[in-house]
A protein has these predicted regions:
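C-terminal/domain-edge helix-coil "capping" segments
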Residues: 156-192
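Conserved acidic
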Residues: 68, 72, 118, 164, ...
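A structural "domain/chain start" motif
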Residues: 2-19, 27-78, 189-192
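N-terminal, post-signal-peptide region of Sec/Tat-exported proteins
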Residues: 70-92
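Surface-exposed short loop/turn segments
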Residues: 87-143, 149-167
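Sec/Tat-exported extracytoplasmic proteins
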Residues: 83-88, 132-134, 179-188
Length: 192
């Protein structure tokens, strides 16, 4: 055909060569986050991320006793411990994680005829600080949040409403635990 020529074949070959060269040059730049014994910036072998995360001691989260916030605080702490240790138990504490939590609930959809909430958003805002145990130096100070929606069933289904709220709160604590784990993992790998 008239549009195919040696010129386009040569261009295609040059493009493939450029892609192969770029791949070869950047191949050593990437490492798995949870890989075994990742090399650190100075070339020495750093402990892997799983081992570093397992050394984080999660402090109790302050909440008034016998309130929904207390249950959510316990759930968040349990989710964090599981995310950091993988369910295997903690190592010797090298870092402490202190958490301050705020809970909010907002009506998302309201029936205009009855004034009843049909869907709501459960929000959890968290401020957290990672401190080295030995030096008491703050190494990470950050915030995160989660917003999760839940449906509110009819007035006759009180237990279903409580379960929907609890499910939304549990999903929000899981999201926050995963976000904190990811942030701490990036700190242990890159020091950021």
């Amino acid at each position: 055909m008239w549009w195919r020529s040696n010129h386009t074949a040569l261009g295609r070959l040059v493009r493939w060569a450029a892609v192969a060269a770029a791949a070869a040059l950047t191949a050593a730049c990437f490492q798995p986050l949870y890989g075994e014994h990742s090399p650190s910036a100075d070339g020495s072998v750093a402990p892997n991320v799983r081992e570093a995360l397992a050394t984080v001691q999660v402090d109790q989260i302050a909440a008034q006793s016998a309130t929904p916030e207390a249950r959510i605080a316990v759930q968040l702490r349990n989710d964090l411990i599981f995310e950091l240790t993988g369910g295997t138990g903690a190592g010797t504490p090298a870092n402490r994680l202190a958490i301050k939590m705020r809970l909010s609930k907002t009506a998302m959809i309201v029936d205009i005829a009855t004034g009843r909430t049909e869907a709501e958003i459960v929000g959890i805002d968290v401020d957290y600080t990672l401190t080295e145990v030995g030096s008491k130096k703050v190494v990470v100070n950050s915030q995160t949040f989660a917003r999760v929606s839940s449906d509110v069933p009819g007035l006759q289904q009180r237990f279903a409403h409580q379960r929907a709220q609890r499910d939304a709160e549990d999903r929000a604590t899981k999201v926050i635990a995963e976000q904190i784990r990811s942030r701490l993992a990036s700190h242990f790998v890159a020091g950021t």
